[in-house]
């Protein structure tokens, strides 16, 4: 029924005025997208259990009354990970929430389907960064799109870690199209930004949303920002459904090679109360972003999603300190001054000179 509706809507003469994709998705689009994100959840969980060595994910399946469900997998008190979760969800409904209609008003009145996998890991050792991942697919009548990304949030600065994470995801993007990373990297800096703090959430990675067969790559909310400017300079870059499917698959599979070497390098490093206190303080920024700015959290709550799964991204322990200022010249100051601001991690050689005096390169 939905696909015949798509064809009827696309056949209307006013479609050219809308933002609806000109390309219909494959007839098995939902099944393939579901299988892809479920497969990523399985692969990532297996890899993380091997990386931790002791912790195991506990799975809880859930059903959404309005349609759909998912499986939440949570690891607690592992050797490496204090807490981490990897979710899969598949939900559908009749009425779209305001957060979606604001971006894609042409989807109004159509039954919708969304599936995705999301992950957040909070390591115990402050020298190991927190990491987040999300890959998703959405359909509603004439509208479909892919979205996703991965970003790294260090608590102590190591230039090599930031470069490795970015380099690995750049290669995954380049495997689909060489222009993608040029837009998705600054888009990540833009999205994971705490406006009330004037900080990025971390060193970024990649982020993309509303990717269909139309127009330019950037479909964000800042038409004058760096991502929009790069996208405009590139012109139209329409990607097919198959290319966008491959993009999510390639970057999802790149996660373990991007993150596991960082964990293996940092986990043996000794730390004390100072480092732990700073980690808990910086985790506060993570909580602030997820509860105030994150569109995924807002979408989940507006669609009556499973609250425990939506808030799984929050760290188990966190602290706030009024008026905190890092000691001048400290590693903590370097993190807040350099690693919470957008940087050209792969192209700016001057970053080495700023990090070297602090032992913050490798």
UniProtKB/Swiss-Prot annotation:
<dbReference type="GO" id="GO:0046872">
    <property type="term" value="F:metal ion binding"/>
</dbReference>
<comment type="subunit">
    <text>Homodimer.</text>
</comment>
<feature type="region of interest" description="Important for dimerization">
    <location>
        <begin position="286"/>
        <end position="321"/>
    </location>
</feature>
<feature type="active site" description="Proton donor">
    <location>
        <position position="132"/>
    </location>
</feature>
<feature type="binding site">
    <location>
        <position position="122"/>
    </location>
    <ligand>
        <name>a divalent metal cation</name>
    </ligand>
</feature>
<comment type="pathway">
    <text>Porphyrin-containing compound metabolism; protoporphyrin-IX biosynthesis; protoporphyrinogen-IX from coproporphyrinogen-III (O2 route): step 1/1.</text>
</comment>
<keyword id="KW-0350">Heme biosynthesis</keyword>
<feature type="binding site">
    <location>
        <position position="132"/>
    </location>
    <ligand>
        <name>a divalent metal cation</name>
    </ligand>
</feature>
<feature type="binding site">
    <location>
        <begin position="134"/>
        <end position="136"/>
    </location>
    <ligand>
        <name>substrate</name>
    </ligand>
</feature>
<keyword id="KW-0560">Oxidoreductase</keyword>
<comment type="function">
    <text>Involved in the heme and chlorophyll biosynthesis. Catalyzes the aerobic oxidative decarboxylation of propionate groups of rings A and B of coproporphyrinogen-III to yield the vinyl groups in protoporphyrinogen-IX.</text>
</comment>
<keyword id="KW-0149">Chlorophyll biosynthesis</keyword>
<keyword id="KW-0479">Metal-binding</keyword>
<dbReference type="InterPro" id="IPR036406">
    <property type="entry name" value="Coprogen_oxidase_aer_sf"/>
</dbReference>
<dbReference type="InterPro" id="IPR001260">
    <property type="entry name" value="Coprogen_oxidase_aer"/>
</dbReference>
<protein>
    <recommendedName>
        <fullName>Oxygen-dependent coproporphyrinogen-III oxidase</fullName>
        <ecNumber>1.3.3.3</ecNumber>
    </recommendedName>
</protein>
<dbReference type="GO" id="GO:0042803">
    <property type="term" value="F:protein homodimerization activity"/>
</dbReference>
<dbReference type="Pfam" id="PF01218">
    <property type="entry name" value="Coprogen_oxidas"/>
</dbReference>
<keyword id="KW-0963">Cytoplasm</keyword>
<feature type="binding site">
    <location>
        <position position="196"/>
    </location>
    <ligand>
        <name>a divalent metal cation</name>
    </ligand>
</feature>
<dbReference type="GO" id="GO:0005737">
    <property type="term" value="C:cytoplasm"/>
</dbReference>
<keyword id="KW-0627">Porphyrin biosynthesis</keyword>
<dbReference type="GO" id="GO:0006782">
    <property type="term" value="P:protoporphyrinogen IX biosynthetic process"/>
</dbReference>
<dbReference type="GO" id="GO:0015995">
    <property type="term" value="P:chlorophyll biosynthetic process"/>
</dbReference>
<dbReference type="GO" id="GO:0004109">
    <property type="term" value="F:coproporphyrinogen oxidase activity"/>
</dbReference>
<feature type="binding site">
    <location>
        <position position="166"/>
    </location>
    <ligand>
        <name>a divalent metal cation</name>
    </ligand>
</feature>
<comment type="similarity">
    <text>Belongs to the aerobic coproporphyrinogen-III oxidase family.</text>
</comment>
<feature type="binding site">
    <location>
        <position position="118"/>
    </location>
    <ligand>
        <name>substrate</name>
    </ligand>
</feature>
<dbReference type="InterPro" id="IPR018375">
    <property type="entry name" value="Coprogen_oxidase_CS"/>
</dbReference>
<feature type="site" description="Important for dimerization">
    <location>
        <position position="196"/>
    </location>
</feature>
